[in-house]
Amino acid sequence: MFITKKHIPRRTFLRGTGVALALPLLEGMIPALTAQAQTAAAPVKRFVGIWHPHGVAPGYWSPVDEGKDFEFSFITKPLEPFRDRTVLISGLDSTAAFSTTEEPGGNHARGAVFLSGIRPRRDAVSPYLGVTIDQLIAQKYGQDTLLSSIQLGIEDASHNSGNCNWGYSCAYTNSISWLNPTTPLPTEVNPRIAFERMFGDGLSAEERRAGRLQSASILDSVTHEIPRFKKNLGSGDQARLDDYLTNVREIERRIRTATNNAAAEVSAEVPFGIPESKDIHFKIMYDLMILAFQADI
């Protein structure tokens, strides 16, 4: 016999003006004494692909030993607390990305192979690749999340036409995610816009902008909802929610600071809203990615 209690739907949002704030997984979302694997709160299948255009040093990633007792390298050391849930695979080759004697160049177009496994067509006018694995996964699991997929980047990749390298279309250089063989998906490089895509509730850009002018923080828009929601939570869930909301506010603060700094330090290369510092830009985008997973966006 199962003892059940009224539980919180997994897709619960805190709502305010122009804001729909997703919540992290809480114990209150799991029916009492119900096997977690049988509930909507069961561990979900999610995917992230991270492309390093200039590659990495394999020796710093691949462990020396095989089997469950391998030793983490210094660069993978942060994963050690999750050893029982981590699999490191090495020794793989993507032959479609190899250069040939007939075509020694075009290395910048090789990023298109990363998630597709397909050698890009050497055509600057009509690029053709294939559906990438992230989009195949999005087709199967994307209906369970607020966004089926989101593409984040660091450098402006809005130009997907023309010849970028050895006769290859710029689309191969600028997009690693393809919806279909002829549609590369653009990356979002502005952390503020990425943040608003995650937490806006579908209103127009103008309405979201007006909401920002009325409220200093996205969280300010849902402040009145938080106490009402928390009173039905246990102490563990209250602490978990507080930690999550703190992370949201901190990332928002850093985005605002970086935006203000970028506006103050006028640059011909960096558009408004994008941090001047590459290090800060990288860190914010990675933290946005973590937040998206935490809230299952």
What are these regions (language model features)?
Residues 1-297:
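Ligand-binding pockets and gating/stacking loops
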